[in-house]
């Protein structure tokens, strides 16, 4: 295998870090961002600390770990991980999860794994988010590999094949776990579905038939449950803008606002629930099925694991009853919890500034974001 084919997309190797650190330290835009993120420490001290990091994990423990736990302490009401379904802590897995937050889904997962004596994950990140050169360098220091997006069909096929080979190499040869979202972009309505395109990409690398190739990846579904999504009002706003403006697309500024709101908005309780590896289930699938049916069966297997492992909060039940005009779950939440959630939804609605604001649509979209995980959870647990 020619490892140089991965040079453009892979995380930096540890021996490359000194040069990259010097490039970052010399970049005024990075200096400004670093002093904003860690305001109480002079930049020269941060630079000195960076230079002492010999590995990517050293860097993550020196900088990212503390920052992420600070975010968790200030902007959540508790951050937890249950990894008991995968007792072998030395094995490399591909964690495929529902996608709620651009930065924190993978960031929180890594610090939780470290606290349970495991390594951090490599992260698939779209190049559309790498809007400045220093960001692209920093994410590659932080164990990210790059998903190339704005390409022609032919380029996309080549890029996907290369990324798949890289991921197979990472699991099999580096024994390094990976996190990847089940779909491109976040599910704006929290109706989480694994995209066939993600599985097709994973099956481009490796050896054997489609099932063998996916088994090589040791896929472990991961359910991420945020009690509150601080970006919910931005997602609702986007629904109306897409309805009202033909061809509406988010700007780079919108992406930055979503990242900032996701990082520093209140999330309530946040729980990560790992399900067992799906290799045994893959063995049960009829390999002679047409490919579309095979991918549909595998996607459904991952989705069901995620749905069953969601953690439900009072707001999910309140949203379901409110949306459907029922009292089906009044035994599960108190009047106080109901009033708290109703107040939260109205508060989020109030943050939306938009021409011809359609409150009925926006409220419905907000409620769906909290009801859909429960709807899918109930269906999966029947």
Residue spans for each PLM region:
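Membrane-anchoring hydrophobic helices of lipid-metabolizing enzymes
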Residues: 1-93, 99-110, 114, 136, ...
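Phenylalanine-focused residue identity feature
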Residues: 6, 12, 21, 30, ...
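Soluble catalytic domains of membrane acyltransferases
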Residues: 57-59, 64-278, 349-352
């Amino acid at each position: 295998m020619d490892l140089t084919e991965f040079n453009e997309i892979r995380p930096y190797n540890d021996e490359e870090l000194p040069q990259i650190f010097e490039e970052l330290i010399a970049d005024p835009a990075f200096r400004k961002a670093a002093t904003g993120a860690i305001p109480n420490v002079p930049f020269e001290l941060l630079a000195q600390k960076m230079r002492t990091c010999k590995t990517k994990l050293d860097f993550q423990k020196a900088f990212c770990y503390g920052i992420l736990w600070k975010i968790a302490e200030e902007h959540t009401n508790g951050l937890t991980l249950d990894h008991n379904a995968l007792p072998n802590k030395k094995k490399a897995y591909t964690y495929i999860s529902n996608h709620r937050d651009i930065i924190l889904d993978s960031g929180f997962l890594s610090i939780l794994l470290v606290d349970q004596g495991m390594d951090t994950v490599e992260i698939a990140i779209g190049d559309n988010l790498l809007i400045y050169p220093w960001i692209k360098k920093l994410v590659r220091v932080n164990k990210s590999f790059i998903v190339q997006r704005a390409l022609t069909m032919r380029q996309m096929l080549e890029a996907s094949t290369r990324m798949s080979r890289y991921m197979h190499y990472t699991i099999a040869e580096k024994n390094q776990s990976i996190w990847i979202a089940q779909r491109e972009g976040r599910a704006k309505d929290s109706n989480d579905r694994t995209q066939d395109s993600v599985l097709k990409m994973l099956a481009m690398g490796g050896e054997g038939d489609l099932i063998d190739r996916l088994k090589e990846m040791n896929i472990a579904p991961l359910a991420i449950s945020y009690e509150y999504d601080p970006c919910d009002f931005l997602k609702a706003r986007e629904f109306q803008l897409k309805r009202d403006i033909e061809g509406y697309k988010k700007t780079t500024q919108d992406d930055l606002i979503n990242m900032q709101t996701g990082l520093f908005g209140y999330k309530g309780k946040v729980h990560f629930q790992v399900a067992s590896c799906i290799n045994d289930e893959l063995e049960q699938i009829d390999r002679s099925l047409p490919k579309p049916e095979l991918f549909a069966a595998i996607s459904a297997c991952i989705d069901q694991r995620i749905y069953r492992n969601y953690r439900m909060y009072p707001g999910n039940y309140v949203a379901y009853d409110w949306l459907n005009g029922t009292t089906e779950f009044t035994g599960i939440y108190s009047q106080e919890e109901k009033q708290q959630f109703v107040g939260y939804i109205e508060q989020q609605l109030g943050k939306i500034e938009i021409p011809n604001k359609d409150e009925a649509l926006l409220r419905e979209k907000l409620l769906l974001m909290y009801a859909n995980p429960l709807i899918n959870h109930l269906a999966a647990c029947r």
